[in-house]
Amino acid sequence: MSSKEVSTFRLYLMRFVYLLNFVLLGSDVWPAIFRHQGAWDPVKGVAFSFWAALSLVSGLGLRYPLKMVPLLLLQLVYKAIWLLAIGLPMWSAVRSSDLAHAMLIGVVVDVIAIPWTYVVASYVIEPGDRWRRQALGARTYRQNA
């Protein structure tokens, strides 16, 4: 198996994570958005908007699990940052929460589901997209036949 190939099991595992996001996160966030009354706290509004978008776009991951890998990476990174910046101080102060446990489980699930060999091959080793229409120094010549 090449570094760009992903096992069928891993594809189904990724689809399971996307499905969890779509169904569980969506069923929690969307009703809260539609039933909310009054003005939102701006920071809380950003968080709910982000989670709503994450749940919605996760639906695409069911059909295109590899194309949506950046979504899983984003999810992993935001949860890891939350655990380090907010969760760790809570645990240090012996004030653990259900949210901290959910974030920790989410990080573990993301680390297991993400096809790391594919990520390295696609986003680290493979050359990036060009920045210009034409590479610097490249010239096009018209051949006269």
Language model regions located:
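Membrane-water interface at the C-terminal end of transmembrane alpha helices
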Residues: 108-135
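Membrane-helix boundary connector in multi-pass membrane proteins
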Residues: 85-103
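Membrane-helix interface segments
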Residues: 64-68, 99-100
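Short, Lys/Arg-rich, polar N-terminal cytosolic tail immediately upstream
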Residues: 1-8, 144
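Juxtamembrane "helix-exit" motif on the non-cytosolic side of transmembrane helices
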Residues: 29-37, 60-63, 88-93, 119-122
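Core segments of alpha-helical transmembrane spans in multipass integral membrane proteins
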Residues: 19-27, 42-63, 76-84
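Short, amphipathic, aromatic/basic-enriched membrane-interface segments that mark the entry/exit
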Residues: 36-45, 70-73
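Membrane-helix boundary elements
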Residues: 6-7, 16-41
